[in-house]
Design a protein with these regions (language model features):
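Compact, charge-rich alpha-helical regulatory domains located at protein termini
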Residues: 1-136, 140-154
Length: 163
């Protein structure tokens, strides 16, 4: 996984899996490599301008495909050839509160498959939209740099909002 974290979004290896140029809006707001995304809480990722839940979901799928290049299990599940049950309810119990879930925690879930990834992301996203961290009128952060500054301020005792 460590090698995957260092893959840059402008590298040929990334472009092989990112056929729809999912990384472009991420690059525009300051993301440079996979590690930049994976280290964030999902709630923070969804609070960055131009990163809506669809783009975030597509990014998680691209990273998942880097981590799991063999797609046979996912294709088998999709085609009802393989039955691999995943309990979102059990996962959610282990992860409470959902506001603290990071992208890394989702991607490193035991027995993760593409369907489970989407179910987990949908659940965390639903929790985000019900939370106090969501504001339908504005994003908290205009770019990754602003988010990092806010995180440093939060560690210093402020409320975590960008100044």
């Amino acid at each position: 996984m460590k090698q995957v974290m260092m893959i840059k979004f402008d590298s040929p290896k990334w472009r092989m899996i990112d056929e729809y140029k999912v990384a472009n809006p991420f690059i525009e707001v300051g993301f440079r490599q996979v590690k930049d995304v994976v280290d964030l809480r999902v709630f923070d990722l969804l609070n960055i301008s131009r990163i809506n839940n669809n783009r975030a979901e597509e990014m998680l799928l691209c990273i998942y495909h880097l981590l799991q290049p063999d797609r046979r299990i996912d294709e088998g599940i999709y085609n009802d050839e393989i039955d691999q049950y995943f309990s979102y309810r059990e996962w959610k119990k282990k992860q409470q509160p959902l506001s603290g879930v990071t992208v890394r925690e989702i991607l490193t879930t035991e027995d993760l498959n593409e369907g489970a990834l989407l179910r987990i992301f949908d659940g965390v996203t639903a929790a985000f939209y019900k939370s106090d961290e969501y504001n339908s009128r504005e994003y908290r952060y205009s770019n990754l740099s602003e988010l990092r500054k806010a995180m440093k301020h939060k560690e210093g005792g402020t409320n975590g909002k960008a100044q």
